[in-house]
Amino acid sequence: ANNELDDQHAIAYLLANENYFDVEGMTVNTTTDGREQTDIDLHYDEALRIVKLMKKEQSVSIYKGATQSFFEIRDDIKSPNFDGHEAVDYIISRAKISENQLVLLPIGKLTNIALALLKEPLIIPNIRIVWLGSNYLDPGEYNQDNDPSALQYILETKANFEMVMVRYGENSGTDAVQVSINEIEKIMPGKGPILKEPITGRHGGTFNSFGDYSVNLFQNYKEMYKEEGSPPSRPLFDMAAVA
């Protein structure tokens, strides 16, 4: 949830379209930014920030998940407090009672879901996984590379598993769904529910709407990459997978 800015827009899109999506909960996990592991609390805080901006904190729960890889955790799966147990147990509990096939929409690495299938394989017929990931036919995709062992395990099960691919540089993947900061600055200010009490953004500042926070995320993204020439547009990988 705390990676760059497409995660936040995917979550907001889901929560804004309640006529189409019945969002019951979210799980988060850590990723690596290429240098070091990210902080699970920062992912949780950013997810909660978006939920609050969309005024859904009373109906959507967030659960902390894995901080390691599937391979590193799997042997501890029978321990009551294994790494990621809160998120994994939530997935299992919801899948067990779902009257229809429960859709899991991971827009990051697959660790939490793979652990849930390992711990309770009986939920496999009850779920449908729609994952934003893979750069097939080519290698090198962030969500896949963050935990290839989780992907491998899921592929070896009989889970209903769909991939929404990135396909860098191609028109046939989510990399083609791009937006410029100029478009964001024109369209997004004030969009979404308006909060009476503003919240603090991850880069500082206070915000009463997701639209204003969206502008801030893009402005900080532009600042972060200014030495590389500030890319004119940014793919919204995760939001494209949701849509």
Q: Whereabouts are the PLM-identified features?
A:
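N-terminal acidic, glycine/proline-rich low-complexity segments
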Residues: 1-243
